[in-house]
Amino acid sequence: RNYIVENVSQSGEVPATGYVPSGVYDAEGANGDDFRTVGGEYYSVSADDYQANCDKARELLAEAGYPNGEGFPAVEYMYNTDDRHKAIAEALQNMWQTELGVTVNLSNQDWNVFLKSRKDGDFQIARNGWIADYNDPCSFLDMWYTGGGNNDAQYSNPEYDALIDAAKATSDQTE
């Protein structure tokens, strides 16, 4: 992620360390802290951890029966027609193929076709860039809520949904 923001997009982005990015308020709103500061980082983007993350990914592939990516089916990475999205797709394709031995086929689509493919769930991996509709963690966390309007991945987990429902129903930050 550091490589992408420093060498590919080069627009001053902060590498993502979780589903909710930096700059989003915590439960106390504008008077509180940054959600990422309070909630901590889900994923380390430090350069020191990059190799360890690659090693862990290779280990998991081997455990699943795909040592060095051998026999792993090709993955399709879909993105909309945009030079920035293309550059990121090509960087990820190179990383996954080099580090994991996983073949990644790139597929670009015009914006309206891309939106329909995502909404229909007709993709394996789809690149998306998005900013929150409002400054609240749920603007991002709702992307994984069953039946949510932005849940293009069609993810569904009753436990996750219950946690989101509980978070929305309380103003007690300790809960």
Predicted regions and their residues:
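Non-transmembrane alpha-helical segments in soluble domains
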Residues: R1, V5, S9, R58, ...
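Solvent-exposed loop/turn segments at secondary-structure junctions
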Residues: R1-Y3, S11-P15, V24-A27, T81-H85, ...
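Extracytoplasmic/peripheral linker and loop segments enriched in polar/acidic and small residues
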Residues: V5-E6, V45-Q51, V102-F114, K119, ...
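Short, solvent-exposed loop/turn and secondary-structure capping segments
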Residues: V5-Q10, G18-Y19, I88-A91, P137-F140
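Short coil/turn segments at secondary-structure boundaries
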Residues: V8-S11, G18-G23, G71-V75
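Structural transition elements
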Residues: V14-E63, D82-K86
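Generic secondary-structure boundary/loop-capping signal
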Residues: A16-T17, P21-V24, G32, I131, ...
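Ligand/substrate-recognition segments at binding pockets and active sites
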Residues: A47-C54, R58-A132, Q173-T174
